[in-house]
Protein backbone atom coordinates (compact mmCIF):
# COMPACT_ATOMS: atom_id res chain seq x y z
CA UNK A 1 0.00 0.00 0.00
CA UNK A 2 2.87 2.38 0.85
CA UNK A 3 4.44 1.62 -2.52
CA UNK A 4 1.27 2.69 -4.36
CA UNK A 5 1.09 5.93 -2.35
CA UNK A 6 4.71 6.73 -3.20
CA UNK A 7 4.17 5.98 -6.90
CA UNK A 8 1.15 8.30 -6.99
CA UNK A 9 2.93 11.09 -5.10
CA UNK A 10 6.00 11.30 -7.34
CA UNK A 11 4.12 12.43 -10.50
CA UNK A 12 2.10 14.97 -8.49
CA UNK A 13 5.30 16.42 -7.01
CA UNK A 14 6.66 16.83 -10.53
CA UNK A 15 3.57 18.76 -11.60
CA UNK A 16 3.81 21.09 -8.61
CA UNK A 17 7.51 21.76 -9.29
CA UNK A 18 6.75 22.75 -12.91
CA UNK A 19 4.48 25.69 -11.97
CA UNK A 20 6.08 29.02 -12.95
CA UNK A 21 6.09 31.54 -10.10
CA UNK A 22 8.46 34.21 -11.46
CA UNK A 23 7.66 37.70 -12.74
CA UNK A 24 4.95 38.10 -15.39
CA UNK A 25 4.79 40.77 -18.10
CA UNK A 26 2.19 43.44 -17.25
CA UNK A 27 1.17 43.81 -20.94
CA UNK A 28 0.81 41.17 -23.68
CA UNK A 29 2.78 41.20 -26.93
CA UNK A 30 5.72 43.20 -25.57
CA UNK A 31 9.10 41.54 -25.00
CA UNK A 32 10.51 42.25 -21.53
CA UNK A 33 14.17 41.91 -20.55
CA UNK A 34 14.57 39.78 -17.43
CA UNK A 35 16.88 41.17 -14.72
CA UNK A 36 16.43 38.85 -11.71
CA UNK A 37 12.82 39.53 -10.58
CA UNK A 38 12.56 42.79 -12.54
CA UNK A 39 11.10 43.04 -16.05
CA UNK A 40 12.26 45.88 -18.30
CA UNK A 41 10.06 46.58 -21.35
CA UNK A 42 11.89 46.65 -24.66
CA UNK A 43 11.47 49.69 -26.88
CA UNK A 44 8.54 48.72 -29.12
CA UNK A 45 8.62 50.41 -32.54
CA UNK A 46 7.60 49.94 -36.15
CA UNK A 47 10.70 49.82 -38.38
CA UNK A 48 10.59 51.91 -41.55
CA UNK A 49 11.31 49.79 -44.64
CA UNK A 50 13.20 51.46 -47.50
CA UNK A 51 13.71 48.61 -49.97
CA UNK A 52 15.33 46.19 -47.55
CA UNK A 53 17.00 48.84 -45.41
CA UNK A 54 15.09 49.04 -42.14
CA UNK A 55 15.50 51.93 -39.72
CA UNK A 56 14.26 53.14 -36.36
CA UNK A 57 14.82 56.62 -34.89
CA UNK A 58 17.46 57.31 -32.27
CA UNK A 59 21.05 56.18 -31.85
CA UNK A 60 20.31 53.93 -28.86
CA UNK A 61 17.45 52.12 -27.23
CA UNK A 62 15.94 53.11 -23.90
CA UNK A 63 15.89 49.41 -22.93
CA UNK A 64 19.37 48.35 -21.84
CA UNK A 65 20.95 45.22 -20.40
CA UNK A 66 24.47 44.33 -19.26
CA UNK A 67 23.81 40.65 -20.02
CA UNK A 68 25.67 39.25 -23.04
CA UNK A 69 23.04 36.51 -23.40
CA UNK A 70 19.81 38.32 -22.50
CA UNK A 71 16.61 36.58 -21.47
CA UNK A 72 13.15 37.86 -22.37
CA UNK A 73 9.61 37.07 -21.32
CA UNK A 74 6.60 37.69 -23.54
CA UNK A 75 2.93 37.01 -22.88
CA UNK A 76 1.69 36.05 -26.33
CA UNK A 77 -1.66 37.33 -27.55
CA UNK A 78 -1.07 38.32 -31.19
CA UNK A 79 2.74 38.00 -31.48
CA UNK A 80 3.86 34.43 -32.15
CA UNK A 81 7.08 33.90 -30.15
CA UNK A 82 8.21 31.10 -32.48
CA UNK A 83 8.38 33.68 -35.30
CA UNK A 84 10.69 36.08 -33.45
CA UNK A 85 14.17 36.67 -34.83
CA UNK A 86 17.11 38.44 -33.21
CA UNK A 87 19.04 41.05 -35.24
CA UNK A 88 22.02 43.30 -34.65
CA UNK A 89 21.55 46.93 -35.75
CA UNK A 90 24.14 49.46 -36.96
CA UNK A 91 24.01 53.09 -35.80
CA UNK A 92 24.33 55.57 -38.68
CA UNK A 93 23.33 59.22 -38.88
CA UNK A 94 21.62 59.25 -35.49
CA UNK A 95 19.38 56.27 -36.24
CA UNK A 96 19.58 52.48 -36.09
CA UNK A 97 19.69 50.62 -39.41
CA UNK A 98 19.41 47.02 -40.55
CA UNK A 99 20.12 45.91 -44.14
CA UNK A 100 18.52 42.52 -44.76
CA UNK A 101 19.39 41.94 -48.40
CA UNK A 102 15.71 41.98 -49.40
CA UNK A 103 14.53 44.41 -52.04
CA UNK A 104 16.94 46.75 -53.85
CA UNK A 105 19.56 46.84 -51.12
CA UNK A 106 21.96 44.07 -50.37
CA UNK A 107 23.01 43.46 -46.81
CA UNK A 108 24.42 40.68 -44.76
CA UNK A 109 22.19 40.86 -41.69
CA UNK A 110 21.24 37.36 -40.68
CA UNK A 111 19.18 36.44 -37.63
CA UNK A 112 21.19 35.44 -34.57
CA UNK A 113 20.42 32.25 -32.65
CA UNK A 114 17.52 32.20 -30.18
CA UNK A 115 15.82 29.60 -28.07
CA UNK A 116 12.08 29.95 -27.45
CA UNK A 117 10.41 27.94 -24.70
CA UNK A 118 6.83 27.90 -23.49
CA UNK A 119 6.81 28.59 -19.74
CA UNK A 120 3.15 28.62 -18.77
CA UNK A 121 -0.04 29.16 -20.76
CA UNK A 122 0.77 32.01 -23.18
CA UNK A 123 4.01 32.97 -21.39
CA UNK A 124 7.26 32.33 -23.30
CA UNK A 125 10.92 32.60 -22.36
CA UNK A 126 13.22 33.74 -25.17
CA UNK A 127 17.00 33.54 -24.80
CA UNK A 128 19.91 34.60 -26.96
CA UNK A 129 21.77 31.36 -27.69
CA UNK A 130 25.09 33.06 -28.29
CA UNK A 131 26.97 35.90 -26.57
CA UNK A 132 26.06 39.33 -27.94
CA UNK A 133 28.48 42.23 -28.39
CA UNK A 134 27.83 45.63 -26.78
CA UNK A 135 25.64 47.19 -29.49
CA UNK A 136 21.99 47.66 -30.52
CA UNK A 137 19.65 44.70 -31.17
CA UNK A 138 16.02 43.88 -31.73
CA UNK A 139 13.64 40.98 -31.63
CA UNK A 140 11.20 41.06 -34.53
CA UNK A 141 8.50 38.75 -35.88
CA UNK A 142 9.73 37.47 -39.25
CA UNK A 143 6.47 38.55 -40.92
CA UNK A 144 6.25 42.09 -39.52
CA UNK A 145 8.10 45.41 -39.23
CA UNK A 146 7.39 45.50 -35.49
CA UNK A 147 10.63 45.55 -33.49
CA UNK A 148 11.43 45.13 -29.80
CA UNK A 149 14.67 47.11 -29.47
CA UNK A 150 17.30 46.87 -26.74
CA UNK A 151 20.95 47.62 -26.16
CA UNK A 152 23.62 45.37 -24.68
CA UNK A 153 26.19 47.52 -22.86
Briefly describe each language-model feature range.
Residues 125-126, 144:
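ATP-dependent kinase catalytic cores of phosphoinositide-metabolizing enzymes
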Residues 122, 128-138:
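A glycine-anchored, Pro-Gly-centered beta-turn/N-cap motif
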Residues 17-102, 141-153:
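Primarily secretory-pathway and cell-envelope proteins
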Residues 8-17:
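Hydrophobic h-region of N-terminal signal peptides that target proteins for export
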Residues 1-7:
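Sec-dependent signal peptide recognition
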Residues 98-121:
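Extended, solvent-exposed segments with strong compositional bias
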Residues 10, 138-140:
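Alpha-helix C-terminal capping segments
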Residues 66-68, 118-120, 131:
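Solvent-exposed loop and beta-edge segments used for protein-protein assembly and interaction
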Amino acid sequence: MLRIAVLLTIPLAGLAAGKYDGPRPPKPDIAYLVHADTLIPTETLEAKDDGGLYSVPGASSSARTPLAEPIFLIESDKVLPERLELYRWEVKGGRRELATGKGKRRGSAKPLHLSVNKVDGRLYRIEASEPLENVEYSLSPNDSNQVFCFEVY
